[in-house]
Amino acid sequence: MEFRGHDEPVDEMGVAYGRTPPSSSSSPAASASAGNGAGAAEVRYHECLRNHAAAMGGHVVDGCGEFMPMPGDAADALKCAACGCHRSFHRKDDGQQQQQLRLLIPSPPTPRVPLLMPPPQPQPHPHPHPQHPYLHPPFPYHHTPSGSGGTTTESSSEERGPPSSSAAAAQGRRKRFRTKFTPEQKEQMLAFAERVGWRMQKQDEALVEQFCAQVGVRRQVFKVWMHNNKSSIGSSSGGGSRRQPQEQQSQQQQQQQ
């Protein structure tokens, strides 16, 4: 690929790059031989670096890998026989660059002798301390209503029973939820508990379900409340024996008929 119009590079004095001054030998071969005779480093020209697309703002080289002088006179000897470019477009290698690179390359660092330190002593593993019984959180205190009277304002949402080991551990970790009732709910539950005799029987299942839906209390919660307040409220009001007069009256009516 050749582009016309690219002349040989000329410096300010009008001398082409790479040409020897008139005072030197007439041919590059003679100069090279003279240099070799004087003991100077051999000068070589490698690949062509001429940019053939400089006018278009690109970068294209012809791919010539080494300068080969044309046979003929001194002017033709400065042109490459492979690419036709001037010798100054080829990369010059006079052997000094390799020497400079050798001087710039730092010497390999001397290996450092590692400092011998004694091995670290193994730390003793801490033994787990036995847990004392007083470190465990105490179980929540459950107030049991006494027979002296007084109504309770709270009721547990779970039935009382013999606490197992797992249940006791669970009680120690979480707080039991307690249902709070309004004064109207307490009055209605008290009246209904006295009506059924503070007991839940099978024949009263439908009545209990209807009452719980009306008051807004779950059946299990009402059952626990009635169990907790039976000894304190039921004994003082005498509600445990209210069914007996009713049963006696029904029997007397049947006998009269």
From Swiss-Prot:
Spans of biased composition, class Pro residues? 106-125
GO molecular function annotation? DNA-binding transcription factor activity; transcription cis-regulatory region binding; zinc ion binding
Specify whether Transmembrane helix is a keyword of the entry. Answer: no
Q: Which GO terms describe its biological process?
A: regulation of developmental process
* Composition skew (Low complexity), residue ranges: 21-35, 141-155, 242-257
- Which sections of the sequence are annotated for DNA binding? 174-237
Kindly list the ranges of residues that form ZF-HD dimerization-type zinc fingers according to the record.
45-93
Q: For site (Required for DNA-binding), what residue positions does UniProt give?
A: 226
Q: Give the UniProt subcellular location, in the record's own words.
A: Nucleus
Q: Which UniProt keywords apply?
A: DNA-binding, Homeobox, Metal-binding, Nucleus, Transcription, Transcription regulation, Zinc, Zinc-finger
* Top-level taxon of origin: Eukaryota
Q: What InterPro entries would the database entry show?
A: Homeodomain-like_sf, Homeodomain_ZF_HD, ZF_HD_homeobox_Cys/His_dimer
Give the start-end ranges of region Disordered.
1-35, 106-182, 228-257
Q: Name one GO cellular component term.
A: nucleus
Which Pfam families does this chain map to? ZF-HD_dimer
For domains, the record's comment is: The homeodomain differs form the typical one by having namely 4 instead of 3 extra amino acids inserted in the loop between helix 1 and helix 2.
> Its biological function?
Putative transcription factor.
Please describe the quaternary structure of this protein.
Homo- and heterodimer with other ZFHD proteins.
Q: What is this protein called?
A: Zinc-finger homeodomain protein 6
Species name: Oryza sativa subsp. indica (Rice)
